[in-house]
Amino acid sequence: MDSMANSVSSSSVVNAGNKPAETLNKTVKNYTPKVPYMCVIA
């Protein structure tokens, strides 16, 4: 699970530089079941 969370965090950080809100919305929708990880990343 750690690797999963890390990959999500990395892609979010990289994409955030381009479209923060849009990327965040997509990430939340794609990984909604992993809410705890999203809280840590956010």
UniProtKB/Swiss-Prot annotation:
Residue ranges of the region described as Disordered: 1-23
The protein's role, per its UniProt record: M-factor is a mating pheromone produced by M-type mating cells. All three mfm genes contribute to the production of M-factor.
Protein's UniProt name: M-factor
Keywords: Lipoprotein, Methylation, Pheromone, Prenylation, Secreted, Stress response
UniProt main location, coarse: secreted
MF GO annotations: mating pheromone activity
Pfam family, one: M-factor
Induction context: By nitrogen starvation. It is further induced by a pheromone signal. Its transcription is limited to M cells.
InterPro entries, per the entry: M-factor
Residues annotated with Cysteine methyl ester modification: C39
Compartments where located: Secreted
Covalently lipidated residues, kind S-farnesyl cysteine: C39
Origin species: Schizosaccharomyces pombe (strain 972 / ATCC 24843)
Residue span(s) of the pro-peptide: 1-30, 40-42
GO cellular component, one term: extracellular region
Bridged cysteine pairs (disulfide): none
GO terms classed as biological process: cell-cell signaling; positive regulation of pheromone response MAPK cascade
